[in-house]
Swiss-Prot record:
It comes from Shewanella oneidensis (strain ATCC 700550 / JCM 31522 / CIP 106686 / LMG 19005 / NCIMB 14063 / MR-1). The gene is hemA. GO terms for biological process: protoporphyrinogen IX biosynthetic process from glutamate. During catalysis, the active site Cys acts as a nucleophile attacking the alpha-carbonyl group of tRNA-bound glutamate with the formation of a thioester intermediate between enzyme and glutamate, and the concomitant release of tRNA(Glu). The thioester intermediate is finally reduced by direct hydride transfer from NADPH, to form the product GSA. It comes from the Bacteria. This is Glutamyl-tRNA reductase. The record marks 95 as: Important for activity. The keyword Metal-binding does not apply.
């Protein structure tokens, strides 16, 4: 078995490239089936978030997987390859465990990524691209992530990209008690944003979503107003802060719409935070004098503060992922030994069946019973000891004392 993890994230690539290799929710099912067809085991999971796209495969060729990624998105090798990272075996296992535990996140220890990895796993099972090894890998990973959160302080005062977005808003506006916020999207990230905003006493919130029912459901919890995406132009001029995170393949807010809203606001400043990949807000909005546009790549100062405060907890968590990845690989190796044992037993049984059948034929032809049984025992013994005898002979001739010692131990020759 050969586990491979290939990916791109916020540390290796800009948001421009990340959005080009991202997989939209409506296409990821077919993408996983396509990727799995390029592996020998048919096992593959794609984790695609605003900060990373990662491919986890069992028995896949690294070069072939990279070619698949480039072909799928229509990208040139020289544009993608320098930003990719890859892990094999235990390092691939440990990387997934670190990702799910929040140790590789833009904001150290953020809990949202675990839910995203779980969702990717569920989609892979629905696509039929999960078998024994990948299933065990992800189930173990979820247990490790839980262990990290319960046994370390990595989850204390848990933060996320949503937390960072609200922290930036607090930094720009001295108080949120008089600010009006427009949230675009109604997914998990925006729900976290709404929670942080409510905790900080924001004056009012409006939630715009493609599906009004989903927005209304969320608004009940946060005493907010729900609108459709088509109503955004009417509410945008009233917003001091706009935070957007949808799965839209095209921008939701264009420069023209924001420019018109700023004129209606008499050029009062507007903070826009785009935490979606692909981006929800056209980059050209940043050219407007009274618009202050930030993306996930602009949150580094908050992230660095977070990393510093959690360094000790992260070190403890790293030890857990190292230990657990080692244990998982022991299980993988045990599977390989099971296959070897099964093959050896099958081979031995085939020899036994062949010789017993030959002995029975001789008895049926009137052969002497004692002579037939002795011959059977001798032939069976010689056939079964042939392979280990050859191995002992080769090790002895080559002076390979280490192998010779291991063979003697395995054959029980040193017990007396």
């Amino acid at each position: 078995m050969s586990l491979v993890a290939i990916g791109i994230n916020h540390k290796t690539a800009t948001v421009d490239l990340r959005e080009k290799v991202a997989f939209s929710p409506d296409k990821i099912h077919d993408a996983m089936k396509s990727l799995a067809s390029r592996t020998r085991s048919g096992e593959a999971v794609i984790v695609s978030t605003c900060n990373r796209t990662e491919l986890y495969c069992n028995n896949g060729d690294e070069t072939d997987i990279i070619e698949w990624l480039e072909e799928y998105h229509g990208l040139e090798h020289q544009d993608v390859a320098p930003c990719l990272y890859n892990y094999h075996g235990q390092e691939a296992v440990r990387h997934l465990m670190r990702v799910a535990s929040g140790l590789d996140s833009l904001i150290l220890g953020e809990p949202q990524i675990l839910g995203q990895v779980k969702q990717a796993f569920v989609k892979a099972k629905e696509a039929g691209t999960v078998a024994l090894t990948i299933d065990r890998l992800f189930q173990n990973t979820f247990s490790v992530a839980k262990k990290v959160r319960t046994e370390t302080e990595i989850g204390a005062a848990a933060v996320s990209v949503a937390f960072a977005a609200v922290s930036m808003a607090k930094h720009i506006f001295s108080s949120l008690s008089t600010t009006k916020v427009l949230l675009i999207g109604a997914g998990e990230t925006i729900e976290l944003v709404a929670k942080h905003l409510k905790d900080n006493g924001v004056a009012s919130m409006v939630v715009a979503n493609r599906t009004l029912e989903r927005a209304q459901s969320m608004c009940e919890e946060f005493n907010a107003t729900a609108i459709t995406l088509a109503q955004i132009p009417d509410f945008l001029p009233k917003a001091d802060i706009v935070i957007s995170s949808t799965a839209s393949p095209l921008p939701i807010l264009g420069k023209g719409m924001v420019e018109k809203a700023l004129k209606q606001r008499r050029h009062q400043p507007m903070l826009l935070v785009d935490i979606a990949v692909p981006r929800d807000i056209e980059p050209e909005v940043a050219d407007l004098d009274d618009a202050f546009l930030y993306t996930v790549d602009d949150l580094h100062s908050i992230i660095e503060q977070n990393k510093a405060s959690r360094k000790e907890a992260a070190e403890q968590a790293e030890l857990i992922t190292e230990e657990q990845s080692h244990l998982f690989m022991e299980w993988v190796r045990s599977l390989e030994s099971v296959d070897s044992i099964r093959e050896y037993r099958s081979q031995s049984m085939a020899i036994k069946d062949e010789l017993v059948e030959r002995a029975l034929n001789k008895l049926a032809q009137g052969g002497d019973t004692e002579q037939v049984l002795v011959e059977l025992a001798n032939r069976l013994t010689n056939r079964l000891i042939h392979a280990p005898t050859q191995a002992l002979t080769v090790a002895s001739r080559q002076g390979d004392l280490n192998t010779l010692g291991q063979l003697r131990t395995a054959l029980g020759l040193d017990k007396n």
